[in-house]
Amino acid sequence: MNRLTLALDVMGGDFGPRVTIPALSLALAQQPMLSFVLFGDQYHAIPLLHSLPAEQQQRIRFVHTSRIVDPHVPVRQALRQSKGSSMRLAIEAVVAGEAQACVSGGNTGVLMGLAKWFVEPLVGIDRPALASLIPALNGQASVMLDLGANVEADSKLLLQFAEMGNIFAQSILSLAQPRLALLNIGTEEVKGRYAIQQAHHVLKNRADLHYIGFIESDKLMNHLADVIVCDGFCGNIALKAVEGVASHFLALFKQPKRSFFVDWLSSWWGRLLYHRVYRALQRVNPERHNGATLLGLSSVVVKSHGSAGVNAYFYAINHAIEQIQNRIPVKISAGLQKLHQNL
């Protein structure tokens, strides 16, 4: 791996430096060519940084700011008050060329607003989309977008999302021809809003895409499609439903509380089934797929779950590294240019 630098909003997320610093330490231990520019409050962060190995500390540059994005105020107000905040400084570091990517667990709306404000958009993209990997029961994953950047999306935006998702899946999932689907309330041709119908008819006639039609939300984890396209409203609801169910099942197996469940587990076949089911559920553990990306920008901006723990935040950092290594913005830009030349 070539040398690369990530800008990190240390204060972002529910737990701030207590999660972000141990997570970046894991990344530094795994990637000897990696370094960080950190933005946050030195009062909270420096004691934790001093506990890291000396070699790791040498690959960290810390920029103090006591300002953070207030998650309790409206997005527009937070954007106006964002100057000097740890989140905004991290994004500005990417724009200035001090880092190749930004990772933050802060307010999603503010992060998207700042990214669209400061980071140059790709030519041919009207609005960026929030994309993430959705785990499947077979251990594979699908790319899903938009997950909340655009509450509404007309057919033109949906088609742009499809283009970006297709290129993203080719690189990240190493697929020559990803299966592409539109999220809908049914698989019948007549189902869905007008925008979905319009996008559907265009995609059906695209010989260069492996478009398979509509997919319903109950099939999201069946790995029937490699790229799932929708507006941000539907995508955000679907994603949280999937993650919530997976997390609750994992919690049930980690901490059985009902006496009949404990008695059942005490039998040999109960323990055998427990371990088999638990291993299967680990395939869809949301922590392993933490990190959503704003596709459609000239730089990599990754949003971690605010509630992420150390391991989950570590996965978000790795997600950013993987995109830099795969030159995702460059590949999306090249793919869009090639598409427009062929139209």
From Swiss-Prot:
<dbReference type="GO" id="GO:0006633">
    <property type="term" value="P:fatty acid biosynthetic process"/>
</dbReference>
<comment type="function">
    <text>Catalyzes the reversible formation of acyl-phosphate (acyl-PO(4)) from acyl-[acyl-carrier-protein] (acyl-ACP). This enzyme utilizes acyl-ACP as fatty acyl donor, but not acyl-CoA.</text>
</comment>
<keyword id="KW-1208">Phospholipid metabolism</keyword>
<dbReference type="GO" id="GO:0008654">
    <property type="term" value="P:phospholipid biosynthetic process"/>
</dbReference>
<comment type="pathway">
    <text>Lipid metabolism; phospholipid metabolism.</text>
</comment>
<dbReference type="Pfam" id="PF02504">
    <property type="entry name" value="FA_synthesis"/>
</dbReference>
<keyword id="KW-0963">Cytoplasm</keyword>
<dbReference type="InterPro" id="IPR003664">
    <property type="entry name" value="FA_synthesis"/>
</dbReference>
<keyword id="KW-0808">Transferase</keyword>
<protein>
    <recommendedName>
        <fullName>Phosphate acyltransferase</fullName>
        <ecNumber>2.3.1.274</ecNumber>
    </recommendedName>
</protein>
<keyword id="KW-0594">Phospholipid biosynthesis</keyword>
<dbReference type="InterPro" id="IPR012281">
    <property type="entry name" value="Phospholipid_synth_PlsX-like"/>
</dbReference>
<dbReference type="GO" id="GO:0043811">
    <property type="term" value="F:phosphate:acyl-[acyl carrier protein] acyltransferase activity"/>
</dbReference>
<dbReference type="GO" id="GO:0005737">
    <property type="term" value="C:cytoplasm"/>
</dbReference>
<keyword id="KW-0444">Lipid biosynthesis</keyword>
<comment type="similarity">
    <text>Belongs to the PlsX family.</text>
</comment>
<keyword id="KW-0443">Lipid metabolism</keyword>
<comment type="subunit">
    <text>Homodimer. Probably interacts with PlsY.</text>
</comment>
